[in-house]
């Protein structure tokens, strides 16, 4: 295979095993459960105390589920996450509890939580007797938090919960814990991108900005580009494969315009294009089959057709027998003299008289007997000889040369004696056409490698009237005095699964260099693990604040202050309580109505 030809992995997830919590989760006090509730992938694990709290979350699965048909009739129930295997055959059935990055369907969210608790080995009866650290969206709506708290406290009866933002947990994991750090977080995930200023360890929610673009929109854009480029492979260009191209073959251009100019050079294109090999079959149907194989295939098709017809006959026979039993039961009602029930049954059967019932019973009995005979005949004649309909070729008559032809040949024999030199014939080389079937099933991914991830810097590429990361970053910085700007740009932090493109850090540094004053300094830091650092940070926070009652929402707080209540901490949203308009007291309303009636009475007098 060529150096720039790559095969799709088409990874298929394996079902998660049901783990055992082990003695580490049940110590002197319950160990917290850490749930990174992402819109693309959910991660769950234990915040185990000790020098080695564990390398990574025990569960990582796609935050989607699919309900199988016939679940209420004993069929397969809803499948969640890795239990789905390959997502593409089920794409039309997939459902997510999220609208963008906000959970809105709590029924599906309950399925995800059930899956997490079951596979983590939570064995407490009737409740989840562990504190929970749960991530939520930036500026999460109060209604969403209220429904989530209601689900956790009422359904799972947890002792306490702490809510936090995934990017702030990632920031908490990567910066020193001994200082109240300030910085500017650029978080880009599956559905949206956020610019989050942090001042002295707390989120400045008033100046947060959101861009409604992320990895999902980049994958959709790449899919449309390649489907327009290769309309013959429309079905093979799936979203899962586009996500694979984004994760493994795309990069961020430091200068988008200059990079496009490079791709115009044929040599640069040939050296940098990535050819994605689609699966294909090189065996042409019918071209290499022998007569015996064709005969065997015909027999298999005939046998399969016979089995299908037999199955249909049995199903029809079963239905006819059930209907016949019902009609015979109605006839017994007539014979026993239960006329009221008999007439009611006739109405349900849409019949008018006992004679019509008797006629229908006779016809149905005859049909059942005939069906049984057909089934017996079909079972007796399972072995069927398949006769080849190819006509026999008559024997060819022997072709014998006549004497006249032999004499004519002998007349020309002296002209071609052994001394006569042979005339040299010109050598004609025939070129056989070569068709590379593998090359026909290749997707050449050239400029698409930089066009798809570029949408978070230029949303206009997909027709979105939004500002990109650079413009939004400049807008947020302009809302602060110069001294605070200098403090924020000293710690620009990149996190989220959509910042893992090669060249992302260099592009942000270039944009900052263009917008900052001449010879000013700044520093850009990429998270050590942009995908898992949110879970690591939530685990670290849970261990550091396990005894801090000012950071956890207890069941008592939930019952007294409502489900939307939030205790603020260094990685949380800002709590903004619901302010309802004050209603006038009944006494003031009575006085007002009394004054109005007295005024009307004096006017009448």
UniProtKB/Swiss-Prot annotation:
One of its GO terms (biological process) is positive regulation of DNA-templated transcription. GO terms for cellular component: Ino80 complex. It is found in: Nucleus. Residues 593-605 have a biased composition (Low complexity). Pfam families: Actin. Residues 287-328, 355-384 form a coiled coil. Its main location: nucleus. InterPro entries: Actin (IPR004000), Actin_CS (IPR004001), ATPase_NBD (IPR043129). Keywords: Coiled coil, DNA damage, DNA recombination, DNA repair, Isopeptide bond, Nucleus, Transcription, Transcription regulation, Ubl conjugation. There is a cross-link at residue 283 (Glycyl lysine isopeptide (Lys-Gly) (interchain with G-Cter in SUMO2)). Residues 581-605 are annotated as: Disordered. Component of the chromatin remodeling INO80 complex; specifically part of a complex module associated with the helicase ATP-binding domain and helicase C-terminal of INO80. Proposed core component of the chromatin remodeling INO80 complex which is involved in transcriptional regulation, DNA replication and probably DNA repair. Involved in DNA double-strand break repair and UV-damage excision repair. Belongs to the actin family. ARP5 subfamily. This is Actin-related protein 5.
């Amino acid at each position: 295979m060529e150096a720039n030809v790559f095969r799709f992995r088409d990874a298929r997830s394996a079902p998660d095993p049901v783990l055992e919590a082990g003695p580490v989760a049940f110590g002197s006090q319950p160990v917290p459960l850490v749930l990174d509730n992402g819109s693309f992938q959910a991660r769950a694990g234990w915040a185990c105390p000790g020098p080695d709290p564990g390398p990574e979350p025990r569960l990582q699965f796609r935050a989607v589920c699919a309900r199988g048909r016939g679940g209420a009739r004993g069929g397969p129930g809803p499948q969640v996450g890795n239990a789905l295997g390959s997502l593409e055959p089920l794409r039309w059935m997939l459902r997510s509890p999220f609208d963008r990055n906000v959970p809105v369907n709590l029924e599906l969210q309950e399925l995800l939580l059930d899956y997490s608790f079951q596979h983590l080995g939570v064995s407490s009866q009737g409740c989840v007797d562990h504190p929970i650290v749960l991530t939520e969206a930036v500026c999460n709506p109060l209604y969403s938090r209220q429904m989530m708290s209601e689900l956790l406290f009422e359904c799972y009866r947890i002792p306490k919960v702490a809510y936090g933002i995934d990017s702030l947990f990632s920031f908490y994991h990567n910066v020193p814990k001994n200082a109240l750090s300030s910085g500017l977080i650029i978080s880009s995930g599956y559905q949206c991108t956020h610019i989050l200023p942090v001042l002295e360890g707390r989120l400045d929610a008033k100046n947060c900005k959101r861009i409604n673009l992320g990895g999902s929109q980049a994958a959709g854009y790449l899919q449309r580009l390649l489907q327009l480029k290769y309309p013959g492979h429309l079905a093979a260009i799936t979203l899962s494969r586009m996500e694979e191209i984004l994760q493994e073959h795309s990069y961020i251009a430091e200068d988008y315009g200059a990079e496009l100019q490079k791709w115009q050079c044929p040599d640069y294109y040939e050296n940098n294009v990535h050819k994605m090999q689609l699966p294909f079959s090189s065996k042409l149907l019918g071209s290499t089959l022998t007569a015996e194989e064709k005969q065997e295939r015909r027999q298999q098709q005939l046998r399969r057709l016979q089995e299908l017809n037999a199955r249909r006959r049995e199903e029809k026979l079963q239905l006819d027998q059930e209907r016949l039993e019902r009609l015979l039961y109605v006839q017994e009602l007539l014979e026993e003299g239960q006329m009221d029930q008999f007439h009611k049954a006739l109405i349900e059967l849409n019949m008018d008289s006992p004679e019509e019932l008797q006629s229908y019973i006779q016809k149905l009995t005859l049909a059942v007997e005939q069906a049984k005979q057909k089934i017996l005949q079909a079972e007796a004649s399972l072995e069927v000889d398949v006769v080849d309909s190819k006509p026999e070729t008559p024997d060819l008559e022997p072709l014998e040369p006549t004497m006249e032809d032999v004499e004519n040949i002998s007349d020309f024999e002296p002209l071609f004696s052994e001394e006569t030199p042979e005339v040299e014939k010109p050598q004609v080389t025939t070129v056989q056409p070569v068709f590379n079937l593998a090359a026909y099933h290749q997707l050449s991914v050239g400029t698409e490698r930089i066009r798809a991830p570029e949408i978070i810097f230029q949303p206009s590429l997909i027709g979105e009237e939004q500002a990109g990361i650079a413009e939004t970053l400049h807008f947020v910085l302009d809302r602060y005095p110069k001294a605070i700007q200098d403090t924020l740009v000293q710690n620009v932090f990149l996190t989220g699964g959509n910042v893992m493109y090669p060249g992302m850090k260099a592009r942000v540094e270039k944009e900052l260099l263009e917008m900052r004053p001449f010879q000013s300094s700044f520093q850009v830091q990429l998270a050590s693990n942009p995908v898992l650092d949110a879970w690591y940070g939530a685990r670290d926070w849970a261990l550091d604040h396990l005894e801090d009652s000012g950071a956890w929402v207890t069941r008592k707080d939930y019952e007294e202050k409502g489900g939307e209540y939030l205790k603020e901490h260094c990685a949380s949203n800002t709590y903004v309580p619901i302010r309802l308009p004050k209603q006038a007291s009944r006494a003031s309303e009575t006085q007002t109505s009394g004054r109005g009636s007295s005024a009307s009475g004096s006017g009448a007098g």
